[in-house]
Design a protein with these regions (language model features):
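Beta-sandwich interaction modules
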Residues: 7-27, 59-108
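Generic structural signal for short, flexible, solvent-exposed coil/loop and linker residues
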Residues: 34, 48, 78-80
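Activation corresponds to long, low-complexity, non-globular regions
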Residues: 1-2
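Short proline/glycine-enriched turn/loop motifs at strand-loop junctions of beta-rich domains
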Residues: 28, 37-42, 96-97
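Short, surface-exposed beta-strand/strand-loop-strand elements in extracellular ectodomains
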Residues: 40-58, 102-105
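Aromatic/hydrophobic beta-strand junction motif of beta-rich domains
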Residues: 33-35, 91
């Protein structure tokens, strides 16, 4: 497990935008994501399977609160997403809501 507590996808962003890109260290199979202050926001996890690939694909997430599966994160909490075979991961904010943070906690 790689501890990525310092990797920030978003930190109090206030407009729609694309996050920083996380390279998949050691070809991890799952990423744990912490989202705070994001009630009412719409976030999408995206990935690429090849470093040369230009298309981004949506990755579904599992809420670690109720184990619900979704293509979007719409509230604060802990989430896990499968990333086996994915080389780059990013988040896209589809809603201009300020004051939220999104961190990658770990890659297993």
């Amino acid at each position: 497990m790689a501890n990525l507590r310092s990797f920030k996808f978003f930190d109090f962003e206030s407009t729609e935008q694309v996050s920083n890109i996380l390279l998949n260290p050691a070809n991890g199979e799952a990423i744990t994501i912490e989202v705070s202050g994001a009630d009412g926001v719409s976030l999408v996890v995206q990935g690429r399977t090849d470093l040369e690939e230009t298309n981004w694909f949506t990755i579904g997430v599992v809420s670690l609160l109720d184990y619900g599966i979704s293509s979007k994160i719409t509230k604060s909490g802990l989430y896990m997403a499968p990333i086996a075979g994915v080389t780059k991961i990013r988040m896209v904010s589809e809603t201009p809501v300020g004051g939220f943070k999104v961190f990658a906690i770990s890659v297993d």
